[in-house]
């Protein structure tokens, strides 16, 4: 069973899906060059710099556009639209924390 967009809203509202908090990690270093080659994922060749934002709403419109999306909802919905299931929740949490996980990226034909 595919996760629904309503499940994404639970994440956005800071609720727990797995019995533990979900934090989102993002690289917004303005010096870093983002590329559009999707083989590398939504962040291009970006590295994870290790700072966290506690709420996805802390992303600015500039950050969202830099990632190549019109809205944060569109960005978060993409892995679900590509067929991740509730059974893939643990892997999604890794993806949601923006840790490169090539097994998942390959699975969703990134």
Q: What are the language-model segments listed below?
A:
Residues 1-110:
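Structured alpha/beta reader/binder surfaces that contact nucleic acids or chromatin modification marks
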